[in-house]
A protein has these predicted regions:
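Transmembrane alpha-helical segments that form the membrane-embedded catalytic/substrate-channel core
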Residues: 28-37, 115-130, 185-201, 211-217
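Membrane-embedded alpha-helical segments that form the functional core of polytopic membrane enzymes
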Residues: 99-126, 133, 181
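Cytosolic/stromal cytosol-facing helical appendages immediately following the last transmembrane segment
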Residues: 1-21, 25, 133, 142-153, ...
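Transmembrane helix interruption/hinge and helix-loop junction motifs
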Residues: 172-180
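Membrane-interface helix/loop boundary segments of multi-pass membrane proteins
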Residues: 129-139
């Protein structure tokens, strides 16, 4: 079994490379052009930033890790809650739909998924800025140069109690797998976009959808603990954490202390902090 698992993970590594490389190349081209004309913080281009190799490593590690974590936790939860144990039976169960959410049109399920998970992630995000949880989230905040590549920098513990947990809860609640197939890439695009070095505020939609400037204030060294929303700033407006002063952009980022470079070093960093 261990050999089969090793083969599966190895194969998934190459599959991930096959999918991620065109994505990185495309995003690199798009944001190189856009940030050349409208940079939020002029300076070194993204391909010369410190920690470039570590950023790229996260783009390989995170998809593989979250894929197997979602599969394992979904199988465990389905067996515990619905008493379904066979892999094919589990797949059929979710494809056929269940519960009242599963009876809704897919577009309604999609809206429900976006709103509920964004609200939950807002509070999860706030919790990761507190106490012992911060050292795991600090991995994401460590770069002093925030770029689109920074979007994938997340510690496994942060992922587990963030997007992975939200996805599994919504799947168990009855949201169709087809919704995840469509909105998974959408969420990745939004996350990549808001980390880009662009002086874009969203204009008249700045209170409706997140923007690069909105999220850069979240990464700023001052003020701290602002703009936690992943997609809809309404949560920050409702709970007093919205911060986008007109005509201003943040200049300094990071956590104010050294973060070891390299994927493995950062994965063990919270255990030593």
């Amino acid at each position: 079994m261990s050999l089969e698992l090793a083969k599966a993970v190895g194969w998934q590594f190459f599959v991930t490379l096959w999918h991620v490389f065109p994505w990185l190349a495309g995003m690199g081209l798009v944001f190189s052009v856009l940030s050349f004309f409208t940079p939020c913080n002029p300076g070194k281009p993204w391909w010369r930033k410190d920690g470039l190799g570590t950023d790229c490593a996260y783009w390989i590690f995170v998809p593989i890790f979250t894929r197997y974590l979602r599969i394992a936790l979904t199988a465990f939860a389905t067996a515990a809650i619905f008493n379904i144990h066979d892999a094919q039976a589990i797949a059929d169960f979710y494809q056929q739909g269940h519960g009242w959410i599963g009876t809704l049109p897919l577009w309604v399920q999609g809206i429900l998924f976006l709103v509920v998970t964004d609200f939950a992630l807002y509070w999860s995000h706030r919790l990761f800025h507190r106490g012992a949880a911060w050292k795991y989230h600090a991995v994401h905040h460590a770069p002093v140069q925030v770029e689109w590549l920074s979007a994938a920098r997340f510690h496994p513990v942060n992922l587990l109690f963030g997007s992975v947990a939200m996805d599994i809860v919504m799947l168990l609640a009855g949201v169709s797998p087809e919704v995840f197939i469509v909105l998974g890439p959408f969420n990745t695009i939004v996350s990549t976009y808001v980390h880009a070095n662009l002086n874009w505020t969203g204009g008249p939609l700045r209170h409706v959808f997140v923007s690069p400037v909105f999220h850069r204030w979240h990464h700023a060294t001052s003020p701290r603990d602002k703009n936690f929303a992943s997609t809809f700033p309404i949560w920050d407006l409702m709970f007093g954490t919205f911060h986008m002063p007109k005509g201003e952009v943040p200049q300094e980022y990071g956590i104010g202390e050294e973060m070891p470079e390299g994927l493995v070093s950062q994965l063990v960093y919270p255990l030593k902090a």
